[in-house]
């Protein structure tokens, strides 16, 4: 969640220094371009998809089986809504990362439309912007900074994000939209739906919801009769899976039958004619594998597995995404992978180097007159003591500390790599090791502060920034939590199950289901010692290979 801030930039108030001429000039340069027909692609929609895309039913909820193309329909339906109304179209998600994904899907539609008429945001960012535009002052109670992150979120939720009265008081000045589409509706709280529909939709406007109750990983929406509780009656069901020839679809169905039979409706796929398969085994495409590893180092084992698959299965790095429910393991593996393979990665979270540099800058701000001795010695060690500022020094120290920690854990693999980077920074690995051994107390204190900063609001803002700038076709291996990758999909998924999954026990089945259904074709599940899920998963995966 992005916390509200009291920003005094009220759109309805003019400023003497910001003239109409200057505004027009800014608008001319910053306005999104026109999307042309030739910018799109020839997408082959099914008959059912075409019916929904061109439907003029003003209120609908769409739910569908795995791989039924819900987001593809949303994008095309949004463009059709613009063509009918020539008005403003609002597309909302829960996951901040889906903004780019939905933008790409809309870009694939063969139609001419102005991008400035499409607003794509997650709920919290949208409400933050609207409260700012309305000039609503955001206030916090005394000793707010002493509250836990959860307490802060509850405060903002009750006073702003779910506060209908706040919008009732400002109803006359709210800018409304001709059509509103909400993706991931299973993650929306009922008050959010009511606020969006009652205050931001023009009278008689189009209001369409998309979602899958089995991906209810945040537990924001209390299910009703095994389904999502929404403010639209009934639903349209999509039964055609466009991954029907892939093993991943069969695995998804078996997972539902094992884990969700008493909780949700099992997906009812349209049946495929199997008359030609009587004498022959079905030849499903894709690759499904499962590994259960005990008493092994998670990071080095994971690297070996992924590297071997890239070589033996000819997997392309751009097609690979590594998912887990927690960031800690992913962040450590990210550094291990980059410095072992000499390849870049694309992550939805901060790198170790980023956090090192961030903390170094924070320490400098708090100790402007005298840095801790070990940091001063590091600056001298890499011969950056005569620099105008510490920008380059802290960047290099951030890298060296990351590789140093890897070397402590995996000396055989990283000793030479550390030495190479030390030479690049005008020192040697021997000198670096000696310095950090002598200054162990100071460096240990630094590492303890790293653990604290990783739980703070600054890191949350950094992660949100990483998510906003995440794109699939980076040419590199992607790493993400399952939560952040929800809504996306990848050709090949490495899904990690850690031994413990604290704080997510209530929704871990949904989290796991969401993770495995992110795969378009290939799925490798790596279970690091979680015996309970090993007993549950092994059987259904063996029959899906």
Regions found by a protein language model. Give the residues of each.
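N-terminal leader/presequence-like segments
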Residues: 6-11, 136-138, 531
């Amino acid at each position: 969640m992005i916390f509200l801030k009291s920003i005094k930039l009220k759109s309805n108030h003019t400023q003497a220094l910001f003239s109409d001429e200057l505004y027009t000039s800014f608008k001319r340069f910053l306005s999104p371009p026109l999307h042309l027909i030739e910018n799109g692609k020839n997408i082959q929609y099914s008959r059912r998809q075409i019916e929904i895309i061109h439907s003029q039913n003003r209120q609908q909820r769409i739910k569908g089986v795995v791989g039924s193309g819900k987001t593809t329909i949303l994008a095309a339906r949004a463009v059709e809504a613009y063509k009918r109304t020539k008005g403003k179209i609002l597309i909302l998600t829960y996951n901040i990362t889906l903004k780019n994904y939905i933008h790409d899907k809309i870009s694939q539609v063969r139609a001419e439309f102005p991008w400035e008429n499409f607003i794509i945001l997650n709920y919290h960012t949208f409400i933050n912007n609207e409260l700012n535009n309305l000039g609503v002052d955001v206030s916090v109670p005394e000793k707010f900074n002493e509250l836990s992150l959860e307490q802060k979120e509850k405060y903002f939720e009750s006073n702003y994000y779910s506060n209908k009265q706040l919008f009732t008081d400002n109803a006359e000045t709210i800018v409304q939209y001709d059509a509103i589409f909400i993706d991931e509706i299973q993650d929306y709280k009922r008050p959010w739906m009511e606020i969006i529909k009652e205050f931001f939709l023009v009278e008689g406007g189009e209001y369409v919801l998309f979602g899958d109750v089995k991906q209810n990983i945040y537990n924001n929406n209390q299910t009703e009769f095994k389904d999502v509780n929404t403010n639209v009656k009934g639903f349209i069901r999509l039964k055609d899976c466009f991954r029907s020839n892939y093993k991943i679809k069969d695995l998804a169905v078996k997972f539902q039958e094992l884990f969700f039979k008493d909780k949700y409706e099992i997906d009812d796929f349209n049946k495929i004619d199997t008359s030609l398969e009587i004498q022959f085994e079905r030849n499903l495409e894709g690759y499904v594998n499962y590994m259960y590893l005990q008493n092994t180092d998670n990071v080095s084992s994971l690297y070996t597995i992924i590297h071997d698959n890239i070589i033996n299965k000819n997997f392309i790095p751009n097609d690979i995404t590594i998912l887990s429910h927690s960031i800690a393991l992913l962040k450590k593996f990210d550094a291990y992978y980059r410095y072992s393979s000499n390849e870049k990665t694309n992550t939805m979270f901060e790198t170790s180097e980023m956090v090192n540099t961030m903390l170094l800058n924070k320490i400098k701000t708090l100790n402007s007159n005298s840095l801790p001795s070990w940091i001063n010695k590091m600056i001298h060690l890499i011969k950056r003591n005569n620099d105008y500022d510490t920008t380059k020094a802290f960047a290099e120290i951030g890298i060296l500390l990351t590789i140093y920690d890897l070397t402590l854990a995996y000396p055989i693999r990283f000793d030479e790599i550390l030495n190479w980077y030390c030479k690049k920074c005008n020192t040697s690995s021997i000198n670096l090791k000696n310095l950090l051994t002598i200054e162990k107390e100071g460096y240990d204190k630094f590492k303890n502060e790293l653990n604290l900063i990783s739980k703070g609001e600054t890191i949350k803002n950094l992660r949100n920034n990483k998510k906003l700038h995440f794109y699939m076709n980076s040419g590199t291996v992607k790493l993400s939590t399952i939560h952040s990758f929800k809504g996306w999909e990848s050709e090949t998924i490495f899904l990690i199950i850690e031994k413990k999954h604290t704080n997510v026990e209530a929704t871990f089945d949904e989290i796991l289901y969401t993770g495995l259904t992110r795969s378009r074709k290939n799925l490798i599940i790596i279970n690091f010692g979680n015996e309970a899920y090993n007993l549950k998963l092994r059987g259904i995966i063996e029959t899906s290979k």
